[in-house]
Amino acid sequence: MKNRTLHYIIRFLVGDDVPSELVETIGYTADPNKFDRYNVVIIPSGFFDGQTYGTPASLPELPLQEVQGIPLLFGSPKEEWVRDTWVVHADIIASTYFLISRYEEMVRRGLRDEHGRFPGKESLPYRAGFLHRPIVDEYRMLLHRWLRQSRLRVPEVKKQIRKIYLTHDVDSPTLYRSWKGLIRSIRDRRGLYKSFQGKFGTLEKDPFYTFPWFCLLYTSPSPRDS
């Protein structure tokens, strides 16, 4: 695993409100000779090993174990003091990476629905029963507890949503302008004139072309999604 990726995940878990110095107190190593460098050490589970990563063997096995009541994808719930370092075998680094990257969609490439999408009911969060839980946020709180347990002062996590970005997928911006749409129009007995008008006419006459209305709705004083 590249140091840049590791640093990003640790920083992501710790949170932007936490000083950078605290990130350096967290180690991701199985080498006991390096434990003394850190306040908290997370033991790698082997998920990122070259022979395992990207293969079906890297996928979590059900049922999942738990660490302090939180579903754990990789590692074990074992926690212990090794001299002055709090060492945990719960690999929340790999678990977080798996969840935020949608890693399983890469490994299970052949599993897609009729639209080419990964089926939600095949996802690990659904099959493991934690689809309704913000597991990565719970990992963050857990990591903060570990840091405090190692006698570090960690700011409280601010419970707020900073920004929400609304997106809208438009699968078919027009109904009749494609060749399939033209055939559909003729099949629906709209007549040849209207069918060809739908194919080659102005966009404003296509019933699916509602972007001006949508933009007006979105920029109104009380925008609503529909």
Predicted regions and their residues:
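N-terminal accessory beta-strand-rich subdomains and adjacent acidic, glycine-rich linkers
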Residues: 1-151
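Histidine-centered catalytic/metal-binding microenvironments
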Residues: 126, 130, 156-162
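Short amphipathic alpha-helices and their capping/turn segments at secondary-structure boundaries
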Residues: 150-160, 212-217
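Conserved, mostly hydrophobic/aromatic
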Residues: 169
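Aromatic- and acidic-residue-enriched segments that line the glycan-binding/catalytic groove
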Residues: 174-190
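Aromatic- and glycine-enriched glycan-recognition loops and surfaces
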Residues: 195-217
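Conserved small/polar residues in nucleotide/adenosyl-binding loops
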Residues: 218-225
